[in-house]
Amino acid sequence: YQRFIAAPLQEEAANEMFVAQQNFQKATDGVASDSLYKLSLNGSEGKFGFLKIADEYSGTDAGNLANYYAGIAYLNTGKYTEAIDYLNKFKSDDIVLGALAKGAIGDAYSQKNQPKEALENYLKAAESNKNDFTTPRFLLKAGKTALTLGNKSDALKYFTDIKENYEATPEAASVDVLIGLAQ
C-alpha cells in the first residue's frame, strides 16, 4: 500500500501544491495579497489550490499541510470561521508549526470578538511545546486577552512567566508595562 498508493499520492499532492505555495508566499510578502491568497486557495495555472489539495489528498502529508495553508490564507483575508475550520483539521508533530496553527486559531477567534475562545487557543499554543519562539509570543497574546476579559491575575501570571523564563525574547522587552497594567 505504502509503495504503490500512498507514496505516489504524496508525490502527486506535493506537485499540485507547488503553485499554490508560490502564490501564498507572494501574498505573505505583501504583493497584491488578497487576490494571491484567493489563488492559493482556489488554484491557478492549471494546478489545484489548497482547498482542493486538502480535499483530494486528505490522507497525505501534503493534504494535511494544505489545511494549514488554507487556514492561514483565510485568516489573512478576513474569513475567520473558515480559518478556524481548516486550522482545526491540521495536525502536526512539528513543534513550531503546531503551535503556530493553534495560535492562528486564537487570532481568528480574537478577530471574531470571541476572547474566551481566543485565550483558550493562545494557551494551547503557548503550552504545546515550551520554546523561545512560540511560547512567549502566545503567552503575550494570552495575557493581553486576559486583560481584555478583566482577568488581571491570569494576565499577570502570563506576563510574569515571560519576564522570568523568556527574558531574552522580543516579547520580554514590553512586558514590564503590561505587568504594571495587570497589577
Spans of model-derived segments:
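Extracytoplasmic/periplasmic/luminal assembly and interaction segments
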Residues: 30-82
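Short solvent-exposed coil/turn linkers within tandem alpha-helical repeat scaffolds
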Residues: 7, 55-63, 77, 91-99, ...
